[in-house]
Amino acid sequence: MLQPKRTKFRKQHKGRIHGEAKGGFNLNFGSYALKAIEPERVTARQIEAARRAITRHMKRQGRVWIRIFPDVPVSSKPTEVRMGKGKGSVDYWAARVHPGRIMFEIDGVNDTIAREALRLGAQKLPVLTRIVAREDW
Protein backbone atom coordinates (compact mmCIF):
# COMPACT_ATOMS: atom_id res chain seq x y z
CA MET A 1 0.00 0.00 0.00
CA LEU A 2 1.02 3.59 -0.54
CA GLN A 3 2.50 5.65 2.28
CA PRO A 4 5.28 8.23 2.58
CA LYS A 5 8.82 7.03 3.23
CA ARG A 6 9.61 9.97 5.52
CA THR A 7 7.56 12.80 6.99
CA LYS A 8 8.58 15.94 8.83
CA PHE A 9 6.10 15.20 11.64
CA ARG A 10 4.48 11.92 12.70
CA LYS A 11 0.94 13.26 13.27
CA GLN A 12 -1.23 15.99 11.74
CA HIS A 13 -4.39 17.87 12.55
CA LYS A 14 -7.58 16.60 10.93
CA GLY A 15 -8.19 19.71 8.82
CA ARG A 16 -10.99 20.36 6.36
CA ILE A 17 -11.16 20.09 2.58
CA HIS A 18 -12.14 23.52 1.24
CA GLY A 19 -12.61 24.65 -2.35
CA GLU A 20 -11.81 23.16 -5.72
CA ALA A 21 -8.62 21.34 -6.68
CA LYS A 22 -5.74 23.75 -7.27
CA GLY A 23 -4.04 21.34 -9.66
CA GLY A 24 -4.29 17.86 -11.10
CA PHE A 25 -7.53 18.43 -12.97
CA ASN A 26 -6.23 17.74 -16.51
CA LEU A 27 -5.51 14.44 -18.25
CA ASN A 28 -1.71 14.26 -18.41
CA PHE A 29 -1.00 10.60 -19.16
CA GLY A 30 -3.96 8.49 -20.31
CA SER A 31 -7.05 8.78 -22.50
CA TYR A 32 -9.66 8.10 -19.80
CA ALA A 33 -9.76 9.26 -16.19
CA LEU A 34 -11.73 9.11 -12.96
CA LYS A 35 -12.46 12.62 -11.65
CA ALA A 36 -13.71 13.44 -8.14
CA ILE A 37 -16.76 15.73 -7.93
CA GLU A 38 -16.96 16.07 -4.14
CA PRO A 39 -14.40 16.56 -1.34
CA GLU A 40 -13.42 13.45 0.61
CA ARG A 41 -10.53 11.70 2.32
CA VAL A 42 -9.48 8.54 0.44
CA THR A 43 -7.45 5.95 2.34
CA ALA A 44 -4.48 3.99 0.98
CA ARG A 45 -6.52 0.77 1.18
CA GLN A 46 -9.31 2.28 -0.92
CA ILE A 47 -6.81 3.50 -3.53
CA GLU A 48 -5.27 0.02 -3.71
CA ALA A 49 -8.70 -1.67 -3.96
CA ALA A 50 -9.70 0.64 -6.82
CA ARG A 51 -6.37 0.04 -8.59
CA ARG A 52 -6.83 -3.74 -8.34
CA ALA A 53 -10.41 -3.55 -9.65
CA ILE A 54 -9.31 -1.43 -12.62
CA THR A 55 -6.31 -3.60 -13.56
CA ARG A 56 -8.30 -6.82 -13.13
CA HIS A 57 -10.99 -5.69 -15.56
CA MET A 58 -8.36 -4.50 -18.06
CA LYS A 59 -6.78 -8.00 -17.88
CA ARG A 60 -3.34 -6.37 -17.52
CA GLN A 61 -3.61 -4.66 -20.90
CA GLY A 62 -2.93 -0.96 -21.14
CA ARG A 63 -1.55 1.16 -18.33
CA VAL A 64 -2.91 2.70 -15.11
CA TRP A 65 -1.67 5.89 -13.46
CA ILE A 66 -2.56 6.75 -9.85
CA ARG A 67 -2.67 10.54 -9.56
CA ILE A 68 -3.30 10.84 -5.81
CA PHE A 69 -1.01 9.89 -2.95
CA PRO A 70 -1.96 9.21 0.70
CA ASP A 71 0.22 11.67 2.61
CA VAL A 72 -2.06 12.51 5.58
CA PRO A 73 -1.56 10.38 8.71
CA VAL A 74 -4.87 9.51 10.43
CA SER A 75 -4.54 8.57 14.08
CA SER A 76 -7.01 6.72 16.28
CA LYS A 77 -7.16 5.36 19.79
CA PRO A 78 -7.83 1.68 20.49
CA THR A 79 -11.39 0.63 21.37
CA GLU A 80 -12.54 1.00 24.98
CA VAL A 81 -9.78 3.44 25.91
CA ARG A 82 -10.70 6.46 28.03
CA MET A 83 -10.28 10.00 26.72
CA GLY A 84 -7.04 11.84 27.35
CA LYS A 85 -3.50 10.44 27.63
CA GLY A 86 -2.46 12.02 24.34
CA LYS A 87 -3.30 11.55 20.71
CA GLY A 88 -3.59 7.99 19.40
CA SER A 89 -1.06 6.30 17.16
CA VAL A 90 -1.18 6.56 13.37
CA ASP A 91 -3.79 4.09 12.13
CA TYR A 92 -3.69 4.61 8.36
CA TRP A 93 -2.71 7.07 5.63
CA ALA A 94 -5.17 9.06 3.54
CA ALA A 95 -5.21 11.49 0.62
CA ARG A 96 -7.28 14.66 0.68
CA VAL A 97 -9.22 14.78 -2.60
CA HIS A 98 -10.72 18.09 -3.74
CA PRO A 99 -13.55 18.38 -6.29
CA GLY A 100 -12.18 18.32 -9.83
CA ARG A 101 -9.13 16.22 -8.97
CA ILE A 102 -8.14 13.44 -11.40
CA MET A 103 -7.57 10.29 -9.32
CA PHE A 104 -6.86 7.54 -11.89
CA GLU A 105 -5.91 7.61 -15.56
CA ILE A 106 -5.85 4.67 -17.97
CA ASP A 107 -4.74 4.16 -21.55
CA GLY A 108 -4.16 1.36 -24.05
CA VAL A 109 -7.66 -0.20 -23.98
CA ASN A 110 -10.81 0.48 -25.99
CA ASP A 111 -13.65 2.75 -24.90
CA THR A 112 -16.04 0.17 -23.42
CA ILE A 113 -13.36 -1.65 -21.40
CA ALA A 114 -11.93 1.65 -20.14
CA ARG A 115 -15.30 3.00 -18.97
CA GLU A 116 -16.29 -0.29 -17.30
CA ALA A 117 -12.91 -0.57 -15.55
CA LEU A 118 -13.19 2.96 -14.19
CA ARG A 119 -16.80 2.32 -13.11
CA LEU A 120 -15.66 -0.74 -11.14
CA GLY A 121 -12.82 1.27 -9.60
CA ALA A 122 -15.19 4.09 -8.64
CA GLN A 123 -17.34 1.64 -6.65
CA LYS A 124 -14.39 1.05 -4.31
CA LEU A 125 -14.00 4.77 -3.52
CA PRO A 126 -15.98 6.84 -0.97
CA VAL A 127 -16.16 9.86 -3.29
CA LEU A 128 -18.63 10.69 -6.08
CA THR A 129 -16.79 10.51 -9.39
CA ARG A 130 -17.20 11.18 -13.09
CA ILE A 131 -15.51 9.33 -15.94
CA VAL A 132 -13.88 11.75 -18.37
CA ALA A 133 -12.24 11.10 -21.73
CA ARG A 134 -9.61 13.04 -23.66
CA GLU A 135 -12.21 13.76 -26.38
CA ASP A 136 -14.20 15.80 -23.81
CA TRP A 137 -11.47 18.46 -23.66
UniProtKB/Swiss-Prot annotation:
Keywords: Ribonucleoprotein, Ribosomal protein, RNA-binding, rRNA-binding, tRNA-binding. GO terms for cellular component: cytosolic large ribosomal subunit. PROSITE patterns: RIBOSOMAL_L16_1, RIBOSOMAL_L16_2. SUPFAM superfamilies: Ribosomal protein L16p/L10e. One of its GO terms (molecular function) is structural constituent of ribosome. The keyword rRNA-binding applies. Disulfide bonds: none annotated. Gene3D superfamilies: Ribosomal protein L10e/L16 (3.90.1170.10). GO terms for biological process: translation. The keyword Ribosomal protein applies. InterPro entries: Ribosomal_uL16 (IPR047873), Ribosomal_uL16_bact-type (IPR000114), Ribosomal_uL16_CS (IPR020798), Ribosomal_uL16_dom (IPR016180), Ribosomal_uL16_sf (IPR036920). It comes from the Bacteria. Binds 23S rRNA and is also seen to make contacts with the A and possibly P site tRNAs. Belongs to the universal ribosomal protein uL16 family. Part of the 50S ribosomal subunit. HAMAP family: Ribosomal_uL16 (MF_01342). This is Large ribosomal subunit protein uL16. It comes from Paracoccus denitrificans (strain Pd 1222). The lineage of its organism: Bacteria, Pseudomonadati, Pseudomonadota, Alphaproteobacteria, Rhodobacterales.
